[in-house]
């Protein structure tokens, strides 16, 4: 039985899921916006938001903890020097999930994941939003 099991399986084993969300989080921190399926976007929120919250307190322990999850020095440095100070006064809700139509191949519901209030362009949303 699957009672009290949180999170989505997404038809992947646990190591694949962990690697996928690590790569998606790295891409989000690098580009400030990514396009993915809606269910992956909702699950990505559970990975990204605690990382930004932890990065608000700059300590060696927090840097090592986040590095153990992201495994990229440049992304960790950007997270602590640019993103965390930007969200210092925000208590949570660092990412925005916008529905972006359906994928052409399998009609999967797509979403745009953006960092809130950060200098991102919303042109991607205008181009890809088509619910017809």
Curated annotation (Swiss-Prot):
Q: In terms of domain of life, where is this protein from? A: Bacteria
Task: Check the record and name the Pfam families matching this protein.
Answer: Ribosomal_L17
Q: Please provide the Gene Ontology terms (biological process) for this protein.
A: translation
Q: GO terms for molecular function, please? A: structural constituent of ribosome
Keywords assigned by UniProt, alphabetized: Ribonucleoprotein, Ribosomal protein
Any one cellular component term from GO for this entry? cytosolic large ribosomal subunit
Q: What SUPFAM superfamilies would the database entry show?
A: Prokaryotic ribosomal protein L17
The annotated subunit structure for this chain is: Part of the 50S ribosomal subunit. Contacts protein L32.
Q: Which NCBIfam families match?
A: L17
Give the family, as the similarity comment puts it: Belongs to the bacterial ribosomal protein bL17 family.
Q: What is this protein called?
A: Large ribosomal subunit protein bL17
- The protein's organism comes out as Ruthia magnifica subsp. Calyptogena magnifica
